[in-house]
Amino acid sequence: MPLCSLENRHLALTVSSSGGTILQLSARRSGGDFPLLRPAMLSDETPAAQSACFPLVPFGNRLKGNTFSFEGKTYRLSPNTADAHYLHGDGWLAEWDCIFQGTESLTLAFEHHSDSYCYRAEQRFLLAGDRLEVTMTVTNLADYALPFGLGWHPFFPLTASARLQAVASGYWQEEAQCVAGKHHQNLPADLDFCTSQPLPRRWVNNGFSGWNGSADIVWPDAGQQLRLTTQPACPVYFLFMSDTRFDPGYQHDFFCIEPMTHAANDHHLPGGGSLTVLSPGAHLTQQMSLQCIALCGDEHA
């Protein structure tokens, strides 16, 4: 199952076993489908970084120094891309197996074994009316406990009128090499999305604290809204806006809001921050829901 497409009267979804990624999620409309996620090339060779959404497992973002200590032992992780850091976990770079496929749902799984993390991850994709529900479970296969976290890295279309609403009470300053640094309580004006605001057109790569696990993205010019919710409510989201220095081919056509069960670099906080310690055989489950909503009075719906 390199690619699998699911659809109902509201949504069309394409998933790839390469990286466990979403390549397409569109709202089905009589006037033409609207991409709720950045459209990607529908190929099993599409890399996760060019997909519409990829999973973060066994934790997300970067780990400062590529090392952490837990229960008296130091673990070292090797960079897994051209980035200097072990980035976004293993799932987005792995080949997943399809272990179930139905008319409106499918489940992918893969296992990872290393000198540090050994685990099994599953993602279940379900079209439930006007919502896509993605449920990810990670199970610790090692014979020792380790801290785990989950999340997703979705790419959303950035249009001239796109707006974002996502509650936050603080954010982490970005340090050299894109590593999360000092936490600040006061949000910059152009990064305060407690009320609906347009997206800044500049480099942004920050985690936000005090989130309630819900966000709304509105594309007024298209008469479309997307509601992102998480269960349990994720306490952190990451906002990413690229630029042409980082990506010379960037067309200012997408942004990312990444729900995470933990903050970046939580391994270095006392108690592991919001990471979840999993004993051998224990598991952690997280759900992300993406709901398409037509704006009232929209003639395109």
Q: What are these regions, as identified by a protein language model?
A:
Residues 110-158:
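Acidic, contiguous internal or C-terminal segments within carbohydrate-active enzymes
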Residues 122-124, 273-278:
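Beta-strand-rich interaction surfaces with strong enrichment in secreted/lumenal proteins
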Residues 76, 155-233, 300:
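Active-site/ligand-binding surface loops and adjacent short beta/alpha elements
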Residues 68-76, 136, 276-294:
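Short Pro-Gly-centered flexible turn/kink motifs
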Residues 7, 73, 78-129:
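Extended, loop-rich substrate-binding clefts of extracytoplasmic carbohydrate-active enzymes
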Residues 85-99, 163-164, 199-273:
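Acidic/His-leaning functional-site neighborhoods
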